[in-house]
A protein has these predicted regions:
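Phosphate/nucleotide-binding beta-alpha loop and adjacent structural elements of enzyme active sites
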Residues: 1-260
Length: 260
């Protein structure tokens, strides 16, 4: 029942997979990162759209149940799962695991956990649908920066990096600064989440971070399900490297810059 509810909710979430594949249509080999993969919906959707392209997928999550959820996906060739948190340091951090509404709010950040309206409303939904009275639990997990992960695994270029980490966006960017500045990622799909009263400050800071590093925001969509009955707001943003925008493979695509 929980998994069915997750897929129903996910169906109404913003979808960027077709846009991403259209951008990369001339690429024959792809390296894709799915950070905060949970049940692997993003990776599975991309796989269906890839046709005959060669690929390598690197999936990341720190929910101990995820490996079970994506067991069939991991049977495929060139799919690599990493039970580690992407952050701004290499070491350990505390993970807030949402047991009552597992597919949302679990993060190194306490942003969602601390939003009383979000927690109360989702607990009510969970209790009605699943008879679930669980809470958040906290436990230590391993962390690594994107810069270190690429260096350690000798990855020179990433075609797509999807990031869904429920409030830890600053930490991700701090740990990926070298990678982004050196133009090692063509496309970044980043969920930006924050409190409604300070969201646009965070949003503008992140958009400006990418602008300074020569990335263009070409598409964005608000996640209405996050804002409903909460003090939170979330927007999915699709950034593309300016270098790749100017390349031959992107020349005939008609995307406009999004006003920040």
């Amino acid at each position: 029942m929980k998994s069915i509810f997750y897929y129903i909710v996910n169906f109404v979430y913003p979808s960027f997979e077709k846009s991403i594949i259209r951008i990369l249509k001339n690429e024959k080999k792809l390296v894709i990162f799915d950070i905060g993969c949970y049940r692997g919906v993003f990776s599975k959707t991309i796989l269906k759209l890839l046709s005959k392209k060669k690929y390598k997928f690197y999936l990341f999550d720190i929910n101990k149940n995820v490996k079970k959820y994506i067991a069939n996906l991991l049977k495929l060739k060139n799919i690599y799962y990493n039970e580690v948190a992407i952050s701004n340091k290499n070491g350990k951090a505390n993970y807030n695991h949402n047991l009552f509404f597992e597919f949302a709010g679990s993060s190194l950040s306490s942003l969602v956990k601390n939003d009383i309206k979000w927690v109360t409303s989702r607990k009510l939904i969970s209790k009605i649908l699943f008879l679930n009275n669980e809470e958040f639990i906290k436990y230590p997990v391993s962390t690594i920066t994107i810069d270190k992960f690429l260096e350690k695994n000798k990855i020179k270029l990433v075609d797509v990096m999807k990031v869904d980490i429920d409030g830890s966006e600053y930490e991700f960017l701090q740990g990926a600064k070298k990678t982004i500045e050196n133009d090692k990622v063509k496309i970044i799909l980043l969920e930006i989440m924050g409190n409604k009263n300070s969201f646009y400050d965070k949003y503008k800071k992140i958009v400006n971070f990418f602008k300074k590093r020569k990335y263009t925001l070409i598409k964005k969509k608000k996640q209405w399900s996050v804002s409903l009955f909460s003090n939170l707001m979330a927007v999915d943003c699709l950034f593309v490297s300016n270098k790749y925008l100017k390349s031959q493979s992107f020349r005939n695509l008609h995307y406009n810059r999004v006003n920040s």
